[in-house]
Curated annotation (Swiss-Prot):
Location, primary (coarse class): cytoplasm
Biological process according to GO: tRNA wobble position uridine thiolation
PANTHER family given in the database record: SULFUR CARRIER PROTEIN TUSA (PTHR33279:SF2), SULFUR CARRIER PROTEIN YEDF-RELATED (PTHR33279)
Entry protein name: Sulfur carrier protein TusA
Native organism: Pseudomonas paraeruginosa (strain DSM 24068 / PA7) (Pseudomonas aeruginosa (strain PA7))
Pfam family, one: TusA
Biological function: Sulfur carrier protein which probably makes part of a sulfur-relay system.
Entry's family note: Belongs to the sulfur carrier protein TusA family.
HAMAP family for this protein: Thiourid_synth_A
Length: 79
């Protein structure tokens, strides 16, 4: 599924904890309600990114896996 995004975070080739650390910074700079697409190759993001969203109140709109690449669409919570 294709979602129009406001920003993209490419964390390919990075391992835990770097993708989530980068995600935290990128979401902070995103406008409330903005949609961020995250591209990652670290399998631990399947666990870490959904937990990140729940913990901070952001919406995990969708997640997909394509040949070892993990894709996430995250909507930043309203202030």
């Amino acid at each position: 599924m294709t979602h129009p995004v406001d920003a993209i975070l490419d964390a390919t080739g990075l391992n835990c904890p770097e993708p989530v650390m980068m995600l935290h910074n990128k979401v902070r700079d995103l406008a409330p309600g903005g949609l961020l697409k995250v591209i990652a190759t670290d399998p631990s993001t399947r666990r870490d990114i959904p937990k990140f969203c729940v913990f901070l109140g952001h919406e995990l709109v969708e997640q997909q896996e394509e040949a070892g690449t993990y894709l996430y669409w995250i909507r930043k919570k309203a202030d």
